[in-house]
């Protein structure tokens, strides 16, 4: 409710301290209330429990919730030296042994955990099922078979984990692992954990896979709808009539449910434009109240800012951590070093990445500009947070093309330079990063010029210099770069074109327009302009990785699908009389055709991911943590996933979700397409395509088969997210819905693990950006 949102703003001083979460709206409340249909106790004693790793295990008689005693674990949170991966110092595991049992009768584990850890707001643990049957669990090199926990200090927590899809035909143990990440505030390096009342249970499992809607639920956008928008919701079945009630309970609209694929029934109440709070009713099912109004997405925008404030690095964030990572350094090839604390922690860990920071700043600038008149306080707060990120981007550059591009950080350092936990990351001269940051700095100039001309001048100098450095290096070899830092010809030139046009808009110098035009010609050469006559769906307008059309460009984790469309849109807006303007518009219209056709192929109006060709992939761009021998991608797995897509011809398939391996979760790829659709809508003044973009936002915010909001703290039934280093953060949008094995349908189990439930600035800023573009 907007009144509740106002109170949250006041209590957090417009999110200058973290926003409190509402556990009653979280899915956990529903899970814990489920009736238990069958159960079996798993006693914890010295005969069946083993300790692995550092620490001491003992039986505790007094501190117990069952009254029968608990297992006590005294565990270090430190280690003598950091792990080479920059992750946990050590892992302590309590294994509850089992004699190779078939546990398929049960689909949930329940236990209680208490942690004594005054200095840690969130104690990260992993609960795993160890299966040695037909399928090994946890799955080597992947993230299946393990459920992560975040346990606060000082209170018994009831933990449940439903695992109906986890292989469990020969289970040899259930483990609880505690990771040593140090403490976020100075404190003794150790915690005490109590584990009690472990049991296996059978419950009615949540819907976790497929396009069918969760039983008893209505799929709708929890944030609400703008007055002029198409307003639709879904039920799995219906008698034919639905009702829309206002806040007084009066029926203001009724309509007929329209049959859809998968047995869905669509409810369309688009004629309702009066602002207010409403509920939907169909066949005895009732939605929660939702907003129709121009301000429907404003609470979500505020919450994304709350997430970013809570993720600040090098800053005392109340309730989460004190100033941090002051001993993390970026090292220039000539040996110079500079501290890189600041900016935002990138995801569930404490990693930083320059390009994600840059995109986040860009989204904040867009929000600040979009809401200057209607929501001035929101605009000012977005501008304030953007400056925090800008400062970091400009402070961590060397002024010669090299800058801090990012580094993996998975622990709280001691903030003292010269000790064993120091992290020294190599600076890099990456043209993609420099292009993106140059464009962001250029966009910031106008927003800061009046209130702080010196800061605006700093932005201007960095924009021009970094663009020049990127130009000089854009054709250098990427062979020594990591998988996540390799870019195709399409990606590099799209980002270069955007950057050139941001500088052209900021400075008015025709050199930048000329550069943008040149880059755009390469982008047009990468676009499919003709339909393959053998395709079952007449698709064109998509892009290849390069001018030779060797492979169609697709994304599985980070996504820049919007980039070529944004480049064309900027050129068409800023140089409408240019001789290439008709060609830019044609490219926009080709992609519009592609979006319009594909938007009608999947339930809920979901945009599919892209076109894949059998036997045509490049594993060098696939990020994989740990030894590649464990869970590494293979051509056999690639082809199996491709064949599960929508068949276009003997070699090409349209996948709803990306082909993916270890890193799964696809909100980023979806929002890349949504941003592209928003750019199309702006450039072509196309309301139909704008609605396609909005539908992708609605999918994320509740109009999906699981009837959950993916933004933590927005709407209801949001799942706990993978955030090992912090409490659950309101406003986080995770990597999110994934796929199961080689299938091509949404998969969203209760299991909480990387990467799909991991909080991420890349996805959260994309939602902020989309809201700004409304």
For every predicted segment, state its role:
Residues 59-89:
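Short carbohydrate-recognition loop motifs
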